[in-house]
Amino acid sequence: DLALFGYAVPAIRAEFGLTLSEVMAIVSAAFLLGGALLVVLGWLADRVGRLPLFQFSLLGSSFLVALISIAPGVITLTALRGASIAVGGLSYPVTGAIITEEMPARLRGLFMGLLQIGYPLGWALASLWSMWLLTEYGWRQLFWVGLVSLPMVWVVRRYLREPPRSVAARSTEPPPRFSDLFA
């Protein structure tokens, strides 16, 4: 969705009558909001488990990205963008943690490499789809692409399990306090 938003900026500017400075402020505010929310979500992943938060990330980011398409104004657009950055961004560290905790050492590098390729591959696919979708349907319909990842929630629920190391850590150690982040 990072690529989608970037490609949609000219059309968003035109629809809402925004200056370039206002667009930069929206993008900055969305990333700041997303970063702050991501800290809280990362803390929650250690508290409730990686797998539930990974599923939440897939489900939540799919819907949040799609909801951008119906944003009635700039404030809603910024809030949805920030929330989608945080919720979607959560999948990356959680997936990395699951891979390092679950994969045998001989496969860990391969799977981390496969995880790393997702970002540039997603950006490339978004670039290709965006050209066509923006031209044919406009910026709002572009964000419905976020729903494409919904079937992954079923795959995760069906085939992944909470890493035993994560379960063991939660059962032997008291849950981390939010203030521990700043200690």
Task: Name the predicted role of every residue range.
Residues 2-3, 69, 85-93, 124:
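Small-residue-rich segments within alpha-helical transmembrane domains of MFS-like 12-TM solute carriers
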Residues 6-38:
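Extracellular/periplasmic helix-loop-helix junction of adjacent transmembrane segments
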Residues 34, 58-65, 84, 149-153:
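MFS 12-TM fold signature
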Residues 36-74:
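Conserved MFS/SLC helix-loop-helix module at the cytosolic interface between two early adjacent transmembrane helices
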Residues 69-80, 135-138:
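Helix-loop junctions at membrane interfaces in 12-TM secondary transporters
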Residues 79-117:
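Cytoplasmic helix-loop-helix junction between adjacent transmembrane helices
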Residues 158-179:
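Flexible cytoplasmic inter-helical loops of multi-pass small-molecule transporters
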